[in-house]
Amino acid sequence: MQSERTITTLSEHACFGGVQGFYQHDSDETGTPMKFGVFVPRQASSKPVPVLFFLAGLTCNEETFAIKAGAQQHAALHGLMLVTPDTSPRNSGVEGADAAWDFGTAAGFYLDATESPWSKHWRMGSYVTRELRRLVLEHFKAREDRIGLFGHSMGGHGALTL
């Protein structure tokens, strides 16, 4: 078993009796620092809780759903943890990554790229389903047997294909 991976707390805020936090870690899958959000309901103080991963759409990031949807209120009521990954690697150094709004940065499509130079960093399918999933299970009271995935727009595509 691998040793526990380190995460950095960027911010944490009281939210509907739980905590909405934003974090960062160095990703093995993308080779870049990655940010993500987690809403932890109060029920997680005494037992592991079910988890829903929300995959955001084009041009979004790990904060979009957390600050715009208001889903924490409902997650708190039902004892659900919400996880919001960023939509792509950022600051990858790949030429052209920031050239268009619908390709590259903020447009990872939750797939693993197969062509160079994208394949080195754009590994969002593996990032969400392997690395971030493990990270959440290691650092938060999450139920491994109760994990769901949903999304909007590009994130809906990701939820259907993953």
Give each language-model segment a name.
Residues Q2-L162:
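Non-catalytic cap/lid and distal C-terminal segments of serine-dependent acyl enzymes
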